[in-house]
């Protein structure tokens, strides 16, 4: 009897990836780790910061893979709309994860040594879709 390996698709988001401004090392690392635990990565897809492109990638990969991992499009800038888009797509809402917020505060205070520089846009990095696992 043949066994079915779980399958995954990795979607990377960001115009900077498409134009070569940033090298995508995240999806390579994720693919290696998934392979190590017995999950077959069937596709790695890069899309820009356009809502329609992200939705299309989600639609296509959801039909073919057991698991979809998304990386990128999560910075504190205005064009990073991945989290609100995912909430809309999956029917959830953004909630602030206090443990993530504490980590961000730690980074600003202890690592960057800029405690007063923590802005609301940085705090929004701790907002996560309540429907994602």
Annotate each predicted stretch with a short phrase.
Residues 15-16, 73-76:
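Short glycine-rich anion-binding loops that position phosphate/pyrophosphate groups of nucleotides
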Residues 2-45:
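Glycine-rich phosphate/diphosphate-binding loop of Rossmann-like nucleotide-binding domains
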Residues 53-56, 81-133:
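Proline/glycine-rich low-complexity loops and linkers
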Residues 65:
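An anion/phosphate-binding loop that grips the pyrophosphate of nucleotide cofactors and donors
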Residues 43-53:
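Short beta->alpha junction loops
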Residues 33-36, 76-86:
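A short glycine/small-residue-enriched secondary-structure motif
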């Amino acid at each position: 009897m043949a066994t079915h390996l779980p399958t995954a698709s990795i979607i990377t988001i960001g115009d900077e990836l498409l134009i070569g401004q940033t090298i995508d090392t995240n999806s390579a690392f994720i693919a290696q780790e998934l392979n190590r635990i017995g999950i077959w990565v069937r596709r790695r897809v890069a899309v820009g910061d356009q809502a329609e492109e992200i939705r299309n990638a989600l639609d296509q990969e959801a039909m073919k893979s057991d698991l979809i991992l998304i990386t990128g499009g999560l910075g504190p800038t205005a064009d990073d709309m991945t989290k609100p888009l995912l909430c809309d797509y999956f029917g959830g809402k953004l909630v602030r994860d206090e443990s993530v917020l504490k980590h961000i505060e730690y980074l600003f205070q202890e690592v960057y040594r800029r405690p007063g520089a923590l802005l609301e846009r940085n705090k929004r990095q701790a907002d996560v879709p309540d429907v994602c696992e």
